[in-house]
């Protein structure tokens, strides 16, 4: 399946797309005064938001997404992928973001090795990834498709509605031989992905659901059943 960029953009503009960024931005609010790389920056929503208080370089291979990117705050944008990273100096970033990228690539290890090279000692690598438990829960509860959920449990990749196949992976295994240490993780989309979309347009839904997600995002077992998990890793 080829990425459907317009469908992806329309989904982000819905209440259930907007609340994802409400939660993520809160989890990133301590990042200020840093030199930051956003690898796989998409429509530039995170790069643009963080550019208010940071020096940001965004890298994205999809030209259509780059053309539609948010630009309320100044930041540098490269079009490309690993090819754009090769010319960057070692240990040149305080913070690197890689959000919902590694599910869609074959060269996951190569990317992680390159991001580690670019990160300063003590620097932060922020990774948002799919959580297999959360994917199965949403498939059974929201989509009402137990057979698809059984296929996911058997190792089948998830067919996303707009970005193609997403492959589950073990982050601990992916970074075990790199100079990266997992510090903590938080959940995103613990509850709201399980709810029928007809509720999500109701007045006050976004605010009340944000309060609920905020209350449990750092707590197990809730963060362990979230659709997305946001990991913070430190460069040793």
Where in the sequence are the language-model features?
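Conserved class I S-adenosyl-L-methionine
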Residues: 1-32, 45-49, 65-68, 126-152, 196
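Class I SAM-dependent methyltransferase SAM/SAH-binding core
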Residues: 43-84
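A short acidic, Gly/Pro-enriched loop at the edge of an enzyme's catalytic core
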Residues: 86-95
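A short SAM/SAH-binding and catalytic strip from SAM-dependent methyltransferases
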Residues: 95-107
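A short glycine-rich, Lys/Arg-flanked "PGG" loop and its adjoining helix->strand segment in the class I
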Residues: 109-124
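Short alpha-helix
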Residues: 162-179, 185
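A C-terminal cap/extension of S-adenosyl-L-methionine-dependent methyltransferases
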Residues: 184-236
């Amino acid at each position: 399946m080829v990425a459907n960029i317009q469908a992806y953009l329309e989904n982000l503009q819905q209440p259930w797309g907007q609340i994802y960024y409400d939660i993520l931005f809160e989890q990133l609010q301590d990042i200020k005064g840093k030199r930051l790389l956003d690898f796989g920056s998409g429509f530039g929503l995170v790069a643009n938001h963080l550019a208010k208080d940071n020096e940001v370089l965004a890298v994205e291979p999809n030209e259509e997404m780059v053309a539609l990117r948010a630009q309320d705050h100044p930041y540098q944008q490269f079009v490309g992928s690993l090819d754009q990273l090769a010319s960057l100096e070692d240990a040149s970033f305080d913070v690197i973001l890689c959000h919902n990228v590694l599910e869609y690539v074959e060269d996951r290890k190569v990317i992680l090795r390159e991001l580690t090279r670019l990160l300063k000692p003590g620097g932060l690598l922020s990774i948002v990834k799919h959580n297999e438990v959360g994917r199965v829960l949403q498939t059974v509860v929201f989509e009402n498709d137990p057979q698809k959920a059984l296929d996911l449990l058997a190792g089948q990749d998830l067919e996303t509605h707009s970005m193609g196949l997403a492959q589950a992976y073990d982050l601990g295994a992916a970074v075990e031989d790199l100079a990266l240490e997992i510090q903590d993780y938080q959940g995103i989309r613990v509850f709201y992905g399980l709810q029928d979309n007809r509720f999500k347009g109701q007045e006050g839904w976004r605010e009340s659901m944000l309060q609920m997600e905020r209350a449990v995002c750092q707590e197990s077992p809730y963060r362990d059943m979230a659709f997305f998990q946001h990991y913070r890793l430190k460069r040793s």
